[in-house]
Amino acid sequence: MSKPFKLNSAFKPSGDQPEAIRRLEEGLEDGLAHQTLLGVTGSGKTFTIANVIADLQRPTMVLAPNKTLAAQLYGEMKEFFPENAVEYFVSYYDYYQPEAYVPSSDTFIEKDASVNEHIEQMRLSATKAMLERRDVVVVASVSAIYGLGDPDLYLKMMLHLTVGMIIDQRAILRRLAELQYARNDQAFQRGTFRVRGEVIDIFPAESDDIALRVELFDEEVERLSLFDPLTGQIVSTIPRFTIYPKTHYVTPRERIVQAMEEIKEELAARRKVLLENNKLLEEQRLTQRTQFDLEMMNELGYCSGIENYSRFLSGRGPGEPPPTLFDYLPADGLLVVDESHVTIPQIGGMYRGDRARKETLVEYGFRLPSALDNRPLKFEEFEALAPQTIYVSATPGNYELEKSGGDVVDQVVRPTGLLDPIIEVRPVATQVDDLLSEIRQRAAINERVLVTTLTKRMAEDLTEYLEEHGERVRYLHSDIDTVERMEIIRDLRLGEFDVLVGINLLREGLDMPEVSLVAILDADKEGFLRSERSLIQTIGRAARNVNGKAILYGDKITPSMAKAIGETERRREKQQKYNEEHGITPQGLNKKVVDILALGQNIAKTKAKGRGKSRPIVEPDNVPMDMSPKALQQKIHELEGLMMQHAQNLEFEEAAQIRDQLHQLRDLFIAAS
């Protein structure tokens, strides 16, 4: 199944890339546990890492600080390794409300969650690839340090089918039920199977467009074939197939029975403690809730909130780390921590927040003490589990620098010859009017501007002021969700507006070559938003444009400003020197605008059932208001056909969207007639 990593790129390493690749590979081969790649914005850090992976042929996990950057990295790695297994592993919750108890108001909040089926399929695909192949790159978020099913139990539960194998049809169906597959002879979808005579069709949980057909003759597997679940067309005939469980948390029956006995023992011990402390209500609550869960586990093999008993189900002792995605990574795997100055502190913070919430649940009798072991990894456990690691950042944190022993691989020269932005410091007193004149200069030559402020209030007031003066401006704030945020960034790049105002959102990983000016208001107010790293990251947003410039408005130069300006000057000098020595003229990046959103949409939206190919739907806004009645009628017929098509494919959400649009078009048609 595995193939060698094969890098697909029209470019060869250039600038600082060849030296960075050589040093990183030497370090890995010498057994260095930690290395840091200091790569400036736009220097091709992902390409450097892809070259290292391809040269060393090692399975790799890439950790990103959020889903947006993970999606961007996943898309880039997919392009670099089209023939290899590039997988995506992030939290599959679109919405998640953990269970919690607020003692002050005696309020218990039930767990509530909405799971994105497509991301669940991608997670299953990621672990399958890690177990089966060596040519695998998994792009993950911090979700990777949360508990996952034990890989040993997961492997034990697999169902292997081979042609010529002697097995009873009922035995196959029983095994599929144990893997949590559901029988559904009407709607054939991911994680289900259907039976027609001696033919069993199985839709693997980790697949989105291929299903398995098992043809039996008496008690022998006569033929195994892969087919398209939408058309029913046979794609290929195969000699063997492995069916993986529908979920990572599947457990063999004997393990569940053993776990139930251990849960009963813990319940008896905990009841004794609560009664000794005269906590009668808590004792009664805990007994009732746990007995209900045990009954469900006995009857169904699982219960709601079964993850709270994960310590017993995986056979771990108290306080032992939970199995995570790191347990699926081979021993010689490689870990790349992207934007490490953000990702590393995130990993450290996850355990403490989770622990505080669960201690309250245990104290007030909502959960057994063993629920505390259903948790993310502690930071020291992450350190112990992490294989050889490369930290990647334009502004590495103290932790990474300390771990790398101060020996940092510098990647400052960009292949395009682009220089770091010119930095100017201007007085605060006239900052708004000065900014307005700078914006007008940029808008006149079709370039974009980013403005970062210190407070929400100031961002709102500035946006209003710029609008009053005729500028096309938008305001980006924390209440905007990820998809809308991506759309705003796309609109900025497309020139729908010229100025984007934000607070702390215009930083890591945003790829906007059209931005030629970054303005930082109140740059001399020392603090988190104006620290050396924040300033360098924000200034870096203008580094992808030939005319890149950053204006820092401040009445004095703070230590953070001095360090940020000094570091930018150091990089700029090195870049200029390299360009002069090699006769390079800086070239602006001409990156397609669709790149940002196309991938995010594929991942963010649950793919349709069956074939799983979501079709683009025309938005109502895209229909011109002045269409003739004849054109409107034609449009209505088109959309009616598309709606019926979606309905036949059981894609009811898409069909409903078109139905709502048809109502609007019919109203327009009546008005126009």
Swiss-Prot record:
SMART domains: DEXDc, HELICc. The keyword Cell inner membrane does not apply. Gene3D superfamilies: P-loop containing nucleotide triphosphate hydrolases, UVR domain. A motif (Beta-hairpin) lies at residues 92-115. Residues 431-597 form the Helicase C-terminal domain. ATP binds at G39, V40, T41, G42, S43, G44, K45, T46. Keywords: ATP-binding, Cytoplasm, DNA damage, DNA excision, DNA repair, Excision nuclease, Helicase, Hydrolase, Nucleotide-binding, SOS response. It holds the Pfam family Helicase_C. Residues 608-627 are annotated as: Disordered. GO terms for cellular component: cytoplasm; excinuclease repair complex. InterPro entries: Helicase/UvrB_N, Helicase_ATP-bd, Helicase_C-like, P-loop_NTPase, UVR_dom, UVR_dom_sf, UvrB, UvrB_inter. SUPFAM superfamilies: C-terminal UvrC-binding domain of UvrB, P-loop containing nucleoside triphosphate hydrolases. Residues 26-183 form the Helicase ATP-binding domain. It is found in: Cytoplasm. Residues 633-668 form the UVR domain. GO terms for biological process: nucleotide-excision repair; SOS response. The keyword Hydrolase applies. One of its GO terms (molecular function) is ATP binding. NCBIfam families: PRK05298.1, uvrb. Forms a heterotetramer with UvrA during the search for lesions. Interacts with UvrC in an incision complex. Belongs to the UvrB family. The UvrABC repair system catalyzes the recognition and processing of DNA lesions. A damage recognition complex composed of 2 UvrA and 2 UvrB subunits scans DNA for abnormalities. Upon binding of the UvrA(2)B(2) complex to a putative damaged site, the DNA wraps around one UvrB monomer. DNA wrap is dependent on ATP binding by UvrB and probably causes local melting of the DNA helix, facilitating insertion of UvrB beta-hairpin between the DNA strands. Then UvrB probes one DNA strand for the presence of a lesion. The beta-hairpin motif is involved in DNA binding. This is UvrABC system protein B. It comes from Escherichia coli O7:K1 (strain IAI39 / ExPEC).
